[in-house]
Amino acid sequence: ATMLSKVSPNWHIDMFERLEGAGIESSNENNNAGTGHAALCELNYTVEQDDGSIDASKAQEINEQFELSRQFWGNLVKNGDISNPEEFIQPLPHISFVMGPTNVNFLRKRYETLRTIPMFDNIEYTEDMETMRKWMPLMMENREPGHQMAASKIDEGTDVNYGALTRKLAHYLEQKSNVSLKYNH
């Protein structure tokens, strides 16, 4: 609705929500992981092919979509349509962690593939226990050597509070004369 109100300001937009407000259910911060869904740590966006290679095309597509979202949100902030972006987006490293030889081999191949793609070229990879302790101290606490483990990390990840973002976007829309938000519908 926000994008439509921008590109077609003469349209009248009715937005319906079953609940009593915006950002209460699926986008609420208690119900959404908030990783930004930029394909930095979500392993399911990189698929191992029958020949053992890694197909990263879905990861590239997802990352491009997320970057477009960030640009859109940045434009809304720049134009004063929404404020205080720190309330809905924070920088946060994205880490993938795996255990077992099959998973470690997959993560290593994923790393080798992603680091050749400009949008992922800052990815780091380790099988070193001490490095993993630095990257994720709570997760590695009391973990004993002897199990094959690996991790990858991209420092430029984000944490998105989709509940806060949704409420900000709804507040913006409530100020628009061509938009009608209908709650409890």
Regions found by a protein language model. Give the residues of each.
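Active-site-adjacent bridging/hinge elements
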Residues: 12-14, 140-146
